[in-house]
Amino acid sequence: MTAEVTPARIGLLIDHLNEKGGYDENILPSLRLVADDYVACGILERPVEFVVRAVQGLPKGSFRPVRDAFYELVDEDALVIFGPWVSENGVALRRYVEALAQVPIITMAASETMLGEWVFGLPAGSMEEEPIIMATVAALDGCRSVGLAFEDSLIGREYLRTTREACCDAGLTITAEISIPQVESDKRVAMATLAADKPDAIMHVGFGLGIVGMNAALEAIGWMPPRYTTTAFEFAATGPWWREQLAGWIGLDQYDERNQVGQEFLDRFQAEHGHRPEYFFPVYCYDIARLMMTALATARPLTGPAVKEALERIKMLPAASGAPGTRLRFGKFIRHGWVGSEFLVARRVLPDASRSVLHATIEGLVEPPDAPPPSAASMRS
């Protein structure tokens, strides 16, 4: 009688929970769909089991549960870990991952300071690159001056440094800088400070929770300029309330409906689950899952160190995220997984908060047939 095969275990370290204490319902179905495909095709010789640890880390919670979750996943025999998601937790966790030197992790956090021998990044953005793209898009829209609101946090201040440089390079004058709390707060005084010099637009940088209330504050002071943000914009995909907070905003995202790799995955997802989640996270999960499955399938032997080496061998895998032509790869000294200038795109939430539309990439403006992008002048009120 043949002994039962032990599943290859993948850890999910989820460090940001929603107001109900949960997380995106499409994450696990997306990951499992890829795992099942690899097993069915014979690429993987054993089943895959996902072990989840979902905790409230920084900024709403604390770092310790994140650290504990990492060690628990290692003890559960995870061969690779997806997470954490938030830069403040990732930067703090790096030393523990590197000291243990047993299991590679792949983070979606945007700070390059957390990357290392055992820490790979497929970031939902990049603190070094997001400001360059954001400033370029603002300049393409005709802006020449901006007021800058930054969250007073590790993330916000790292963004602040790179945004100053990006605005200078794009020919944008920063008329004022104002720090805002990383959590919800009254923004009227801060917005009035930015409004004093009447810049062409305002920019927000940070994790994203600080953006809550900015629209209401701007409306209260009677000033609604063009508004730009980083991948904090991706909160718009989580539901109507967040789309209201981001109504009229232009921000960075990873969902591009023109990407056929992503659309083909969504076709399969819809056929399997009966609905079509047309936003960044499912296609991102398709990308991260293929990286992990490929590494598990090619690791010899099937251990954490061998999985790390297998990740380093992945080259030019077509990505479902980003604009068409985006690809995935790691390397011996390469820990940033995206290839291509358009791995991030700019989208815009419509004024009625009903949905977002494609707006631009770093290479130029994009005009959706049913929602042409406004000029900077027409966006002002």
Question: Where are the regions a protein language model picked out?
Answer:
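Extracytosolic ligand-binding ectodomains
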Residues: 1-381
